[in-house]
Design a protein with these regions (language model features):
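The feature captures the beta-strand-to-loop junction immediately N-terminal to the Walker
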Residues: 35-37
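Helix-to-loop junction immediately C-terminal to a conserved catalytic motif
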Residues: 50
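Conserved coupling/switch loops of ABC nucleotide-binding domains, chiefly the family-specific signature
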Residues: 56-59, 209
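Conserved ABC transporter NBD signature motif
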Residues: 58-66
């Protein structure tokens, strides 16, 4: 049985429709990240599920029961919103303990649970401090601890790592999934950070303009985005999109890039004779100086070393800028200048230029 089920959920404000007929089913114990650009409706969705806002249409089912009209306090949800909403006159300890106190937990139980979640979120040293003495990151983690301390069956987290410094944010990306799974809660986790969504979610629901564009595992979304809109949201540098007009031949589809004929393999014939966008992730491009190895000519404009890889900014003969991301010693010595870029057709994506929809085979 799904712990959270949304059916045709819609919400509009005076400025226009924010959510448009959302359907989503989240299984017990699953972590689903709601990911999308700013203004997509992510926080509004959490507020509807929490009961803070009312939907204009559709239904919300929690643990198999229709909770669309249920009062917030009767939904059994742990919540951590972006604005923290901490009690200003209470210590971090008492803020975290507030839900446990409301449920009549013993003093020993309260201390044990608060100490446990505070240690996991690295805020044990500030438990005696009031919110005014906490940094934004500490406030955010205190709100997160409060959401988890009472062991709710459903947890809603609204960008809980947004105000956390870079080092701790990286650590929490690694630790949060284990923490959330240990709580046995079903989690909806809102974020604008695609890396965070991929690291934490069992699945990702990509919300664009009030609609779920794609709901799938992180790997599926990265390798097989259903549209240009989804593809652009994942990856840094982002996906290269090269306008092409593929033609069918004896060896399958081919196209012209930067004045060179490039094979697309036998699996992409659906795009023949149409204006398409060839989608190439930067890491799928191999750059070399030897024309005999195949590929299409480019000019390497800039080389940026980044840890153990280099990011190459290149320009085709048509003037389009594309990126390649490569690891290896040879890239440390690469200089700007003429080169050739090639790719494995099996890793290429094809999008209809007019609709943006992905067509044909997907990696």
């Amino acid at each position: 049985m799904a712990q959270i089920e949304l059916k045709s959920l819609s919400k509009a404000f005076k400025t226009g429709k924010v959510l448009d007929g959302l359907d989503l089913s989240v299984e017990e114990g699953e972590i689903v990240c709601i990911f999308g650009p700013s203004g997509a409706g992510k926080t509004v969705l959490l507020r509807l599920i929490a009961g803070v806002e009312e939907p204009d249409a559709g239904a919300i089912f929690l643990e198999g029961r229709d909770a669309t009209d249920a009062a917030p306090e009767r939904r059994g949800i742990g919540i951590a919103f972006q604005n923290f909403a901490l009690f200003p006159h209470m210590s971090a300890f008492d803020n975290i303990a507030s839900a446990l106190t409301a449920h009549g937990a013993t003093v020993a139980t309260i201390k044990a649970k608060v100490d446990k979640v505070a240690a996991m979120l690295k805020i044990s040293h500030v438990l005696n401090h009031e919110p005014r003495a906490l940094s934004n990151g500490q406030k955010q983690r205190t709100a997160l601890a409060r959401a988890l301390a009472a062991d709710p069956k459903i947890v809603l987290l609204d960008d809980p790592l947004r105000n956390v410094d870079a080092k701790l944010r990286y650590e929490m990306r690694l630790e949060l999934p284990s923490l959330l799974r240990a709580s046995d809660a079903t989690v909806l986790y809102v974020t604008q950070d695609y890396k965070e969504a991929m690291a934490i979610g069992d699945r990702i629901a990509v919300l664009i303009d009030g609609r779920f564009e794609q709901v799938a595992t992180p790997a599926s979304i990265y390798r097989a985005p259903v549209s240009v809109g989804v593809a652009r949201l994942f990856g840094d540098p982002t996906i290269n999109l090269i306008p092409v007009n593929p033609q069918a031949g004896g060896d399958g589809l081919s196209c012209e890039i930067s004045g060179a004929k490039v094979g697309l393999g036998a699996a992409q014939v659906e795009g023949a004779g149409r204006s398409m966008l060839l989608g190439l992730r930067p890491e799928s491009l191999v750059v070399n100086d030897d024309a005999g190895l195949g590929g299409f000519p480019v000019d390497v404009v800039a080389v940026t070393p980044l840890n153990e890889k280099s990011v190459l900014l290149m320009r085709t003969r048509d003037g389009q800028e594309i990126f390649a991301s490569e690891a290896g010693v040879e890239n440390e010595e690469r200089k700007p200048g003429p080169a050739f870029a090639r790719f494995d057709p099996a890793r290429a994506l094809m999008f209809d230029e007019a609709s943006g929809a992905c067509i044909g085979s997907r990696p």
